[in-house]
Amino acid sequence: MNEQMKQYTGTKTVKAMPMTMGEAYERKLLKNGVRPSECETDKAGYLVEYEDGYQSWSPADVFEKAYKPSETRLDRLRIECDELRARSKELDAYLNEGYEKAAAEIGRSLTMLLVLQSSYLHNYLDVLEALLLTTKKE
C-alpha cells in the first residue's frame, strides 16, 4: 500500500436482502461487462441499497464480513457488545505486555489512564452482557 495513503474507517447503514448473482445480473446490478458463468448464477449474495437509494450486489462472504443485522434493539446491542469486546481485548493485549514496557513507550500517566480505561471497558462490557441476557429472556 502507498505510504502516503492514510487509513480511514467508516460505517454505513444499508438495507439488504439475499439475492443470487444470477438475479443480480438479470436486474443489471453487476458491473458493466460482468456476466456470471453458469456455475456462478447460483452464487449467494445480497442486494444492497444505500441511504441515497443506490443499489448494488455484493457476494455473501464480502457482505457478511462488512455488515451485521441491526434491525432490532437486540441486534444493535450485540454489535455494540462485539465491538467493545474487540477493543477491550486489543487494549488488554497491549497492557498485558507489561506495565513497565508500556510506561517506557508512552509514559506512566498515559499508561495509568489506559489501565483505568481497560477497567471501565470491562465494567461497561459486563453491563452490556447483562442487558443481552435479560433481553433474550424477555
Predicted regions and their residues:
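Acidic interhelical loop/turn segments
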Residues: 97-112
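Long amphipathic alpha-helical coiled-coil segments
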Residues: 130-138
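Motif-centric detector for short Cys/His coordination patterns
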Residues: 1-95, 113, 119, 126-130
